[in-house]
Amino acid sequence: PRLVSSAASDVYKRQPKNLSDTPAYSTYPGKDLQMDYEEGLFIGYRWYDREEIEPLFAFGHGLSYTTFDYSNLRAVPPKGTSSVAAFELDITNSGDVFGKEVVQSYVKVSESKIDRPIKELKKFEKVSLEPGESKKITFELTERDLSFWSETNQSWQVEPAEYIFEVGASAIDIRESTSVWLG
């Protein structure tokens, strides 16, 4: 049973520790009833990553009556016809009660030549596990998942680089990482 409605609790999950930690703080309250939001791609967890600010509750933060172990993250050959990269991991309910976990998959580009977020959420999967139960989760990524918009070429492009795949329970609770070269 929930003690607080999910709608009410969601508000608190996105709260900064300090008002000055918010992206719009430097431009608030605007001028002549006009408020400009200048963070561009760097909204939410992307802003906090770039500014190296730890929010009160990170994007994806949640509570559970049990614990989960993430292990064996590894790159695997993609199975989907449009997939260009894939990886899998094992997740285990290491607690004493049934639980659900949202496994979040983030992608980083090592030494990117373009201005982009430090990491981007690309996939997620909710798993339900009995105590001691394990499941294998596979994430497949398409070219579009790894692309950025090139203003110069007016098209989506994949930057040739080392791509770091991270999985975790929230934007700052990263449990495992692995990498592959794409390009």
Annotated model-derived regions:
Residues S20, F42, E51-G183:
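Intrinsically disordered, low-complexity Ser/Thr/Gly-rich stretches
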Residues P1-Y12:
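Single conserved hydrophobic/aromatic residue that forms the stacking wall/gate
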Residues L3, Y37-G40, V158:
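A generic fold-level signal
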Residues D10-Q15, G40:
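Extended hydrophobic/Leu-rich segments
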Residues P1-R2, M35, N153:
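A generic helix-loop boundary/linker signal
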Residues K13-K31:
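Internal, active-site/partner-interface "lid" segment
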Residues P29-E39:
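Extracytosolic ligand-binding ectodomains
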